[in-house]
Every structure is written in structure tokens, then in C-alpha cells.
């Protein structure tokens, strides 16, 4: 069953008995029907769109893309995440029902990519916002790599215990790395923070040559002017 082995029942026996636990049954049902919420913001998402075609056929994994976070149990982030997007992404993750999983796809999502050095508005890794289960590096990763990431996530689901996962999330509520976010009043006003913008001096504030000379003359004391006048008069 897609690289995940389960004991098969003997269909020839009439009185077959299934011996399992509620946790194993729950894991089997969840890994066979992952419903992803597609959060694509950049070019990496184009590679995931290739899985929809008949060549890769991601329907065989039980993947059904959803447009509502309340109906999804997997969020796949692909592309750059900016500071302005961060609250929306966290809100989408919190609206997903438990248990929920995250796949970080691409270098820009995992580390910030080429925007991680000079950009002041890029989040250096989506794991600073939401907990990530599977990291998928690449720029962009191939569709085969995405299938491998989904397979690894299904293996993780098949072995986990739901109670342990909930305890781990309560103890380590995200974030092993300290981020440097600045709390603002609102991000949906449409106005930029003026402190980050360099304001060029206006033309009215640039003094002309006449104003400079006049300012210099005003700065000279009257005593100096009298002395200079007397000096020129003697000559």
C-alpha cells in the first residue's frame, strides 16, 4: 500500500478476525485520506500542480485538495512567506482541526531562500510560525520529491500515537528558534511603516547660497562688525 506495509486478511477464511487498536485504526484512516490546504505563494507551487496530472496522479494517495482550512488536515506551504502574510498563515493553521500536519516545500519556505539576507520583510523559515512535520528542500523540488515527502509523512502518521502528539504540542508549542518580530498595531491599514523608508530632503529645506550668506552675516556679532568697519576706515 504505497510503500507502507499492512497485514493482509486471508479472504479464503470465512471467520476472519481483525485484531487492532483504536489508535492504529485512526492512523490508517488518516494516512489514506490526507486533505491538503494548498498555500502556494511562489514558483514552487507550480511543481505541486504537476502532481494533478495523469503522469503522477496524486489521487492514488487519497489527496483531495481543499479550499477551506476547516476541511483540511494538511497544509502545504510553498514559496516565500512575508511578515505581512505571517498572521494569515497562523490563522489558517489554527482553523484546521486536529490532528493536522505541515509540509514545508522549497528553500524559500524553509530558510527564506535568496531573500533571507537582504529582505527585511521575509520570514526566515515557516517553522518560526507553525510547527513543520516534513521539510522538502529544493529550488524548486521535483514532483517525485513531493511524492517522497508525502510518503514519509504517511509513514510518520502510521507510527504515531495521537495522545503523545497532543502532549508534545502543548509542551513545545512551536518554535525552537527565536524570531525577531516587532509587534505593530495593525497590518491591514495599507500604510507602510515610515521608519523603514528613507525620506529624501525636500527642495524647500535645502538652503540656497543667498540664504547661507545671510545666515552667516546674522551669526556675526555687532562688535565684530564695528571692529571690521574701523579697520577698513583707517586704511
UniProtKB/Swiss-Prot annotation:
UniProt keywords, alphabetically: 4Fe-4S, Chloroplast, Iron, Iron-sulfur, Membrane, Metal-binding, NAD, NADP, Plastid, Plastoquinone, Quinone, Thylakoid, Translocase, Transport
Keyword Metal-binding carried by entry: yes
Name of the gene this protein is made from: ndhK
Catalyzed reactions per annotation: a plastoquinone + NADH + (n+1) H(+)(in) = a plastoquinol + NAD(+) + n H(+)(out); a plastoquinone + NADPH + (n+1) H(+)(in) = a plastoquinol + NADP(+) + n H(+)(out)
Cofactor details (free text): Binds 1 [4Fe-4S] cluster.
HAMAP family (UniProt xref): NDH1_NuoB (MF_01356)
Membrane topology value: Peripheral membrane protein
Annotated protein name in UniProt: NAD(P)H-quinone oxidoreductase subunit K, chloroplastic
A GO molecular-function descriptor: iron ion binding
Self-association state and partner proteins as the record states: NDH is composed of at least 16 different subunits, 5 of which are encoded in the nucleus.
Organism of origin: Ipomoea purpurea
Annotated disulfide bonds: none
